Amino acid sequence: MSGHLHIGIVVGEASGDILGAALMTELRRHFPNAEFSGIGGPRMLELGFHSYFPQDRLAVMGLIEPLKRLPELLRIRKFLREHFTANPPSVFIGIDSPDFTIPLEGALKEKGIKTVHYVSPSVWAWRQKRIINIARSVDLMLTLLPFEARFYEEHGVPVEFVGHHLADAIPDNVDKTAARQLLGLPGQGRIVALLPGSRSSEVERMAELFFRTAVFCIEQDPSLHFVVPAANSDRYRQLHIELNDFVDFPIHLVNGHSQDAMAAADVLLVASGTVTLEALLLKKPMVVAYKMAPLTYRILSWLVKTPFVSLPNLLAQKMLVPELLQDKATPEALSAAVMNYFENPEQSMAVSQTFADMHRELKCNASARAADAIARLIKPAEAS
């Protein structure tokens, strides 16, 4: 399968650039002379990808910024639709950014171009009617999580679970001692990692709550130490200011090193998000907390169809780790949940073992598996 062919790819986020670059590498196993074009990030460009626009032009967040940028985003999508219609690729792959890529996939599929979407939107959780448009728009959905694939199968959408790239990247066993040495933490004793979020608004809402929780934990066990990894330099400065109210307290603030901080800890207190998957893959017992604006929470409570918010619980389909949201997220309740792991080591070990089983399920060499599925779609007979 060394024939020359053209593969179109559009990614809208930095995480998509990582996936796209790994996918390009694996697709070249099947198609060594393939050409790739569309919109990609720096990692993809290093591999010879031709990007018609800078990838960061699609990187919009929230509700307001996409509206402000809507005319530009529509112009970019129109160009891509017309370009790929005039120069049909053997397959078009949209990675993440579903509000931008799925309508483009639908328009190209109408022209007879095979389409793939890599990384499912959270259609299983909210706005489930999107499945109708997704079914019309894609020839194949590639999911990172097994329960997502089951959802698409139930709705008759061609799908393949390929595994999660983080499960491939994070080792089965992490060295707690080495992580503690790297961060200058005590080699012995109990350590709790506090991860209040990566965005300014999250840190503003969650940091003080997490630090007050640490105070309650210290009252129960004065030997505890805490480590707080800041997502970047801006969050480091923000957290440093928040810590001014907690002087003479055993909290170690570090810039970056979030995985090292989690690896060094015995228990984690985390804001809900992707970090819960990283914590799972590091086999760390965790307590999940989150707060948002009351109106936003009421709207999401009405829209979201799942009983859980954290990936460990979604994967387990049960309350495997504590989730404390909104008014339930108090320092008293969070500290009780954290200390419960220390007071019940058998429970901690059981959670860690379940996480190890989940890691094995998610570790599938995702990029290779995705490339194999795409190759079968392009050339069913030759790729089988």
Swiss-Prot record:
BP terms from Gene Ontology: lipid A biosynthetic process
UniProt keywords, alphabetically: Glycosyltransferase, Lipid A biosynthesis, Lipid biosynthesis, Lipid metabolism, Transferase
Enzyme Commission number(s): 2.4.1.182
MF (Gene Ontology): lipid-A-disaccharide synthase activity; phospholipid binding
GO cellular component, one term: membrane
SUPFAM superfamilies listed in its UniProt record: UDP-Glycosyltransferase/glycogen phosphorylase (SSF53756)
Enzyme class, first EC level, given as a word: transferase
Catalytic reaction annotation: a lipid X + a UDP-2-N,3-O-bis[(3R)-3-hydroxyacyl]-alpha-D-glucosamine = a lipid A disaccharide + UDP + H(+)
Function: Condensation of UDP-2,3-diacylglucosamine and 2,3-diacylglucosamine-1-phosphate to form lipid A disaccharide, a precursor of lipid A, a phosphorylated glycolipid that anchors the lipopolysaccharide to the outer membrane of the cell.
Family (UniProt): Belongs to the LpxB family.
PANTHER family the record matches: LIPID-A-DISACCHARIDE SYNTHASE (PTHR30372), LIPID-A-DISACCHARIDE SYNTHASE, MITOCHONDRIAL-RELATED (PTHR30372:SF4)
Protein name: Lipid-A-disaccharide synthase
Species whose genome carries this gene: Cellvibrio japonicus (strain Ueda107)
